């Protein structure tokens, strides 16, 4: 079985821009991870109408954007449902400036929270750990980089924040997200 690989940030960005969609790769991935972590079905295409409504006034996407969006969705499902938990955020690479990466992280986190809302997350029925993780993400979404401060120190802090975002997301997904049911778990009579 081949491993599903996340498309590169620039590939996703190009496909979205070329399709005339006003959504960044970070926003798209954040939305998808939020919806999946909030309990969206993994077995059908219910994510597409939600994405169309949120990003394109309900209009479908061109085929090239759908292809890339589907690849991002499939890779995200694979990451979030794997035995070894690993989630790579689709944000600008380390080659980009710290400002661009911080903006990408902010977009990602804001859209993750929106993705939870799209699947109608009910906070009153969640654990304290989930509420704390969500509160941390809401705080992180408001963070910014101060150009006057030590950029090397901020770079180190940024990496710690990215790791904390991953932990918060995995905490939320562990409580609310669906898991893929494999054939091995089915009973044969």
Curated annotation (Swiss-Prot):
<dbReference type="InterPro" id="IPR011978">
    <property type="entry name" value="YgfB-like"/>
</dbReference>
<dbReference type="InterPro" id="IPR036255">
    <property type="entry name" value="YgfB-like_sf"/>
</dbReference>
<dbReference type="Pfam" id="PF03695">
    <property type="entry name" value="UPF0149"/>
</dbReference>
<protein>
    <recommendedName>
        <fullName>UPF0149 protein VFMJ11_2207</fullName>
    </recommendedName>
</protein>
<dbReference type="GO" id="GO:0005829">
    <property type="term" value="C:cytosol"/>
</dbReference>
<comment type="similarity">
    <text>Belongs to the UPF0149 family.</text>
</comment>
């Amino acid at each position: 079985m081949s491993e599903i690989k996340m498309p590169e940030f620039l590939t996703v960005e190009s496909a979205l821009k070329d399709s005339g969609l006003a959504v960044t790769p970070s926003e798209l991935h954040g939305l998808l991870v939020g919806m999946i972590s909030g309990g969206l079905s993994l077995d059908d295409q219910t994510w597409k109408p939600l994405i169309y409504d949120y990003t394109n006034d309900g209009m479908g996407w061109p085929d090239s954007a759908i292809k890339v969006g589907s690849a991002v969705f499939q890779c995200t499902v694979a990451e979030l449902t794997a035995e070894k938990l690993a989630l790579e955020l689709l944000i600008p690479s380390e080659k980009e400036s710290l400002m661009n990466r911080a903006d990408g992280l902010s977009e990602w986190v804001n859209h993750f929270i929106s993705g939870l809302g799209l699947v109608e997350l009910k906070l009153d029925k969640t654990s304290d750990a989930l509420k704390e993780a969500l509160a941390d993400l809401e705080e992180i979404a408001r963070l910014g980089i101060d150009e006057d401060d030590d950029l090397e120190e901020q770079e180190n802090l940024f990496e710690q924040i990215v790791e904390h975002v991953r932990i918060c997301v995995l905490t939320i997904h562990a409580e609310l997200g669906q898991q893929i049911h494999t054939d091995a778990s089915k009973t044969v009579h």
